[in-house]
């Protein structure tokens, strides 16, 4: 189990990024972290990985305390893997060589089998002999994920893992990756702006605002009852509708056009969304 206990961190006294964060995550569970840019998502992942010296609080994985650079010559926990947005790949060797980099050379057959398995997960078999410098940003992102999984981690930390990947590839890659992690019982934390990472694949969702945890619950519960417009807006367009004396939040699909109503609206635009039209009215 991962236990994050009342941690705070700032890059300076005047720039506190994480304010008293507390949550737990069971082994094998998947957590998504959402929030506006600059709210602390990436910083939280770095803190959990052990790249930062906390101002206060502590982090435990099972019986082991996660300690920062002050306590390690090489920061970062050995049984965690962290995939940042800059990938940190080796550009002049092939895709398969990047994946094999941290696998044992004493067991070449096992290393090759593991590499082929991960190439299937990231849908990159056709590029196994391609040098990384010749790949697109999205392809590099997929290789970085595979390399992180090569020596099977207990906890995988992913920072915007599908941000540079083509839309037509995202869905199948998500399904492959998260199914693989569940099958291997690998705990995963994903920092993301994309609601699809959370709604379809996460066991828990944390929303951050103003450097604090605003909500922490199952994604379905947060989506159905978002409490604040800021939270609802992470998933979809949202309307504040007055019902009686109360103001309630409603997604577009929860509003219907009827022949007779106490409320009138004038359509000012419409947007084709493939399976439906989004109507803008005032």
Regions found by a protein language model. Give the residues of each.
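Helix-to-loop junction immediately C-terminal to a conserved catalytic motif
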Residues: 49
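A short, proline-enriched helix->beta-strand linker immediately N-terminal to the Walker B motif
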Residues: 150-154
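Conserved ABC ATPase "signature" region
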Residues: 110-127, 179, 185
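ABC ATPase NBD coupling module
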Residues: 66-81, 105, 222
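Conserved ABC ATPase "signature" C-loop
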Residues: 210-211
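Conserved ABC transporter NBD signature motif
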Residues: 57-68
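Conserved ABC ATPase signature
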Residues: 131-135, 139-141
């Amino acid at each position: 189990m991962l236990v994050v206990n009342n941690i705070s961190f700032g890059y300076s006294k005047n720039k506190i990024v994480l304010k008293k964060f507390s949550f737990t995550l069971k082994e094998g569970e998947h957590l998504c972290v959402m929030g506006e840019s600059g709210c602390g998502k990436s910083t939280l992942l770095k803190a959990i990985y052990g790249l930062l010296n906390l101002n206060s609080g502590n982090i435990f994985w099972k019986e082991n305390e996660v300690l920062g650079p002050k306590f390690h010559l090489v920061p970062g926990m050995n049984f965690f893997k962290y995939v940042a947005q800059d990938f940190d790949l080796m550009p002049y060797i092939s895709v398969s060589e990047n994946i094999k980099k941290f696998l044992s050379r004493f067991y070449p057959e096992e290393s090759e089998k593991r590499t082929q398995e991960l190439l299937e997960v990231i849908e990159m078999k056709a590029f196994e002999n391609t040098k990384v410098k010749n790949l697109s940003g999205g392809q590099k992102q997929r290789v970085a994920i595979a390399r992180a999984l090569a020596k099977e981690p207990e906890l995988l930390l992913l920072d915007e893992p599908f941000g540079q990947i083509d839309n037509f590839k995202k869905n199948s890659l998500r399904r492959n990756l998260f199914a693989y992690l569940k099958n291997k019982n690998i705990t995963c934390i994903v920092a993301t702006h994309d609601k699809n990472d959370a709604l379809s694949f996460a066991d828990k969702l944390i929303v951050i605002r103003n450097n604090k945890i605003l909500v922490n619950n199952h994604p379905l519960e947060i989506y159905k009852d978002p409490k604040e417009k800021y939270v609802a807006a992470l998933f979809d367009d949202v309307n504040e509708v007055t019902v009686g004396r109360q103001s309630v939040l409603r997604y577009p699909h929860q509003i219907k056009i009827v022949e007779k109503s106490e409320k009138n609206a004038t359509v000012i635009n419409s947007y084709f969304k493939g399976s439906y039209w989004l109507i803008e009215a005032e």
